[in-house]
Design a protein with these regions (language model features):
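N-terminal transmembrane-helix/juxtamembrane module of multi-pass inner/ER membrane proteins
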Residues: 1-67, 105-118
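Membrane-water interface at transmembrane helix exits
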Residues: 25, 38, 42, 72, ...
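Interfacial segments of alpha-helical transmembrane regions
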Residues: 73-97
Length: 204
């Protein structure tokens, strides 16, 4: 199986998984599991809030946009070839994740956890936008850096995974999202990153 087909399969699988989970969030089983996680995290929140605020930073627009720009700039400066092969995939990772998670939220208007609602966070919960955005940019950036020969997969893959997991966990720790929102965010980010990686292959 070539790279394009493998990426297409991964992206389609992630997208289908995200939609399936969106439907599943309406079921009693998933809601019960989400409440169980929230019940366990709630008493820990005062102690982990500071670490969670740091962990969530990579999902902020002021972080993932510059991160994508830094990856693109590194590729352009270090390697020959069209700059668009880096600019388009990295820009699409940020913008694509934002557009997709907002589109899904418009369809599945899921309420946030009580903690978030009490703090005025009333926009739909599923999927976690911070998690989706960070995952898309991190995964796309890691893929491009490896394909360009600028970083070994043994280094960038663990770093990207660790940061992506930290962002997702922080959204639950801060009380902004249910655990299934975060899983949906990871799946959304993977789906978007797969499309961006395919675009890179076509532009290279």
């Amino acid at each position: 199986m070539n790279d394009t087909r493998a990426l297409a399969v991964a992206g389609a699988g992630a997208a289908l998984g995200m939609v399936a989970l969106a439907v599943a969030t309406q079921t009693r089983l998933v809601r019960r599991m989400d409440r169980a996680v929230e019940w366990r995290v709630r008493p820990l929140r005062p102690r982990i809030r500071r670490a969670a605020r740091i962990g969530t930073l990579a999902g902020e627009p002021y972080a993932h946009w510059p991160l994508g720009a830094a990856v693109a700039a590194t590729i352009i400066v270090c390697n020959d070839g069209s700059p668009w092969r880096a600019v388009i995939p990295m820009g699409s990772a940020s913008l694509g994740a934002i557009l997709v998670h907002h589109a899904v939220k418009a369809v599945y208007a899921r309420a946030r956890p009580r903690h978030a609602l009490l703090l005025g966070k009333t926009e739909p919960a599923y999927p976690s936008g911070h998690t989706a955005d960070a995952t898309a940019v991190l995964a796309t950036g890691a893929y491009l850096l490896v394909r360009e020969g600028l970083a070994p997969v043994a280094v960038v893959a663990p770093v990207a995974v660790a940061i992506g997991l930290a962002v997702g966990a922080s959204r639950v720790a801060l009380g902004w999202h249910w655990s299934s929102d975060v899983i949906g965010g990871w799946l959304t980010g993977i789906a978007v990153a797969s499309g961006c990686a395919i675009a890179y292959g076509q532009l290279r």
